Amino acid sequence: MDILAIANQKGGVGKTTTAVNLASALAHRRKKVLLIDLDAQGNATTASGLDKRELEYSIADVLLDDLPIHEAIVKTPNGFDIVGANNELSGSDLHLSQKPENHAILSKAMQQLAAMPAKNGRVPKPYDFIVIDCAPSLSLLTINAMCATSG
């Protein structure tokens, strides 16, 4: 599984466009892809065809409330899965800064994906790629994304 973070401190440089199009192109090539939206604006979520206001769970629930990441995964109409974001992620740095090992929370959540139990006797196929769309800042969220990448 390759984990890629699309990051830049400057806004408006195409991070979200790159992340969504990369996820879509990989899915089109029959790769199993998970897109993680780590920006409170939720533009990757919206660009993936979802309404960020209607998410049952978001990446904020995973990072701040310890929700297992697989419970926040939603299928998109574009052939890839997403863990969406919304404004619940705003101000998350303050909450994350109070957690132990706050730089590795996303990494631990992704390790849960690798250790997913079998359902109905079938082991779920692991993701070929995880693409992380970062906010335009060097925050604890971006640090989590960088620590979660595969190289």
Language model segments and positions:
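P-loop NTP-binding core
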Residues: 1-151
